[in-house]
Amino acid sequence: MWDQGGQPWQQWPLNQQQWMQSFQHQQDPSQIDWAALAQAWIAQREASGQQSIVEQPPGMMPNGQDMSAMESGPNNHGNFQGDSNFNRMWQPEWGMHQQPPHPPPEQPWMPPAPGPMDIVPPSEDSNSQDSGEFAPDNRHIFNQNNHNFGGPPDNFAVGPVNQFDYQHGAAFGPPQGGFHPPYWQPGPPGPPAPTQNRRERPPSFRDRQRSPIALPVKQEPPQIDAVKRRTLPAWIREGLEKMEREKQKKLEKERMEQQRSQLSKKEKKATEDAEGGDGPRLPQRSKFDSDEEDEDAENLEAVSSGKVTRSPSPAPQEEHSEPEMTEEEKEYQMMLLTKMLLTEILLDVTDEEIYYVAKDAHRKATKAPAKQLAQSSALASLTGLGGLGGYGSGDSEDERSDRGSESSDTDDEELRHRIRQKQEAFWRKEKEQQLLQDKQIEEEKQQTERVTKEMNEFIHREQNSLSLLEASEADRDAVNDKKRTPNEAPSVLEPKREHKGKEKERGSRSGSSSSGSSSSGSRTSSSSSSVSSSSYSSSSGSSCTSSRSSSPKRRKRPSRSRSPPAKARRSRSRSYSRRVKVDSSRTRGKLRDRRRSNRSSIERERRRNRSPSRDRRRSRSRSRDRRTNRSSRSRSRDRRKIEDPRGNLSGNSHKHKGEAKEQDRKKERSRSVDKDRRKKDKERDRELDKRKEKQKREEKDFKFSSQDDRLKRKRESERTFCRSGSISVKVIRHDSRQDSKKNATKDSKRHSGSDSSGRSSSESPGSSKEKKAKKPKHSRSRSLEKSQRSGKKASRKHKSKSRSR
């Protein structure tokens, strides 16, 4: 039992409880007529008597509000909210999926609020606490003034929830989606409620009777109907609310169907307009957006009207606010939206694509008439007949053909222009590449020309130097020949022949050595050439001085040979002459080496492009030819001697003996020469290997030391030039003295001897050999090259004389 103000809660009679329970169990809640049930319950309640009518408690205000209830409201709210059955009983959808809950057995009657409500602060133009409004969105909050269940059911209007005047609609207006008039009948009047102040009324009360659904206007039911409705049990009120919600859902479905039909009609009109129009069109505004805007405006109006006119049930609140939609309806709306969006996008894209395709087709069709057909002789002959003129205007066809030809001309010109640009770029690249190649080839040619010019200049210089040397040596030989008497000519021929043989051997050796060293690079040859040039300059200088000094000697010779004091001077200067001989022999040995190196360098330059194997073969072939020639000559001489032995023996016995000795000597020489050649060939091979290694080293060091060597060689050549000049003067003087001595001894021998001129000529080789042994080596080196030339002529004369003998 709950208490309120010390008054006990009246229990239902047993027959009422049994009747209600039997009624609930007999019928299905979905098929119950809740209005008839409520009328029956009210009639039974009135028949049971008005025992529950009690006077108001002393703490009532003039407007029917209980002060003690207002004070105890929050406490009761807190206590009641802690109950475990509270949340289960007061769910927002408690009447949708299950039967209304039965009253508890211990607490027989518990009238709930019409819906979860919340007190809203008063409006601006109301100063009293009685003008509270229900917020439409806060539906799940329980009213704090709805828990005072201390009074009887008939006086339940005295509670703080029923503090407003229902007739004037300050907080609860007449139900707009409410019950039909026959469901509620006027009952006995209850206690009159005090009138409400006008300042507590909202100013826009009469203007806010709006709703999106047009319903018949009903008269305001009396206050008794509202009070009776509040006194109904919870399960009957739940049934009534359920019935109202079902009606609202039906109305909403009808409205949605109308909207859908309107949308479909608008879509059809839009598609018809799009098909009728030509060309691309801009995307039209979506119709669904405008409908949503209209719905938003209606919902705002409904919310504003819902704040003013309220019913005790939550059904009218849902009508004024946005209607709650089921999941199926939401899915259906989403499908509609997606369809609309997709169709709009598809239409836009297809319109653009169709426009571009049509444009391309039109452009191609205008290009279709070719020039050949427009200008062909067949068409000209057909048009000349006159029968085709009536089928169409020729001017339009000509214009079309001209347009097509112009467009085709422009396209062809563009293509040609592009092709020309590409060809020009390609040609430019080719020209650049060719220019680069030509430049490279020219540079290579210039380098080769420079190298060849340098080589030619070098060879020319060497040839000039050799010619100068030969001229100087020829002058020396001529001077020496003039010094000698004509009687010494046959004695001189023999040593010249011997010099020839030696020179040939030396030439073959130098050829082989030069062939072995021909594989060396141009750097070594250039270095040797620089050395040779310096030596040539020094030798030329010495030859000039010698030629100058020889002229006064000629004048002094007869006086020296005739006068006896000259002999004393010679004997005195022998020691001095020996010293001079040693020095001159050294200098001449150096000159020989330099000449040999010069000759070898010249041969290397001539044989650069030749391989060493070819040079070796040629040198060997030359040596073989020389051997064969010598052997053939010796055989021919032997045959001649054998053919005429008797004629030669009579009167020329001494000559045969001399020739036999000479042949024996030649054979011995040839044998010794062969042995020497073999040894020298071996030594050359070794030297070649050594030279190759040296050349590799010298090539590395030559780059850095070539310049320094050139400077040093120039300085040495200048020094040697001065020294050789002084030495050559001394040597020439000494030679002239020796020649005078030899001439004197020869004259004495000739006068004393009684032999014939033939013996003297036959014995001349032996005497010449003895003289040759006495001669120093440096005197031979001077007359080697010129003796070859003059010796050839003398040998020919000697051979002719020997044959005639």
UniProtKB/Swiss-Prot annotation:
Low complexity: compositionally biased ranges: 509-550, 754-767
Coiled coil: 237-276, 427-461
Subcellular location: Nucleus speckle
Region annotation Disordered: where it falls in the sequence: 75-331, 382-805
Basic residues composition bias: residue spans: 551-560, 567-579, 587-598, 607-639, 771-781, 789-805
Glycyl lysine isopeptide (Lys-Gly) (interchain with G-Cter in SUMO2) crosslink, residue number(s): 218, 496, 703
Compositionally biased region (Polar residues): 75-88
Biased composition (Gly residues): 384-393
InterPro entries: PNISR (IPR031937)
Residues modified to Phosphothreonine: 485
Feature: compositional bias, Pro residues: 100-115, 183-194
TM region positions: none
Record field: compositional bias (Basic and acidic residues): 197-210, 238-258, 421-463, 473-486, 494-508, 659-721, 732-753
Domain of life: Eukaryota
Family: Belongs to the splicing factor SR family.
Subunit and partners: Interacts with PNN.
Designated name of the protein: Arginine/serine-rich protein PNISR
Organism of provenance: Mus musculus
Source organism phylogeny: Eukaryota, Metazoa, Chordata, Craniata, Vertebrata
Gene for this chain: Pnisr
